[in-house]
Amino acid sequence: MQKSEGFRSKTRYKLQKHPRQKGMAPLTRALKCYTEGDLVHVVLDPSVQKGMPHPKFHGKTGVVVAQRGSSFLVRVKDGGKYKDIIARPQHLRESKL
């Protein structure tokens, strides 16, 4: 039988929440606005499936390039290339740097 290679495959621990963080995230996280040039970390929230970037970008840091509706276009370095990913604000955290 062929092995399944879905969007969330091999994410058993990556898309798991700790017991104290279970449930929905605060509403302010969904309403967060970023401006062009902001440094953001891609931190996937498994309780929100909409606007979730591919799990391989979890933990990466990128620059906000533009806003697409309620989502943001983030430029992330993947290997030697820059890739643009579209993510909702629930999956982004502002960098402290």
Swiss-Prot record:
GO terms for molecular function: structural constituent of ribosome. Residues 1-24 are annotated as: Disordered. InterPro entries: Ribosomal_eL21, Ribosomal_eL21_arc, Ribosomal_eL21_CS, Ribosomal_eL21_sf, Translation_prot_SH3-like_sf. Keywords: Ribonucleoprotein, Ribosomal protein. This is Large ribosomal subunit protein eL21. GO terms for cellular component: ribonucleoprotein complex; ribosome. GO terms for biological process: translation. Pfam families: Ribosomal_L21e (PF01157). Residues 9-21 have a biased composition (Basic residues). Coiled coil: none annotated. It comes from Methanococcus maripaludis (strain DSM 14266 / JCM 13030 / NBRC 101832 / S2 / LL). Gene3D superfamilies: Ribosomal protein L21. Belongs to the eukaryotic ribosomal protein eL21 family.
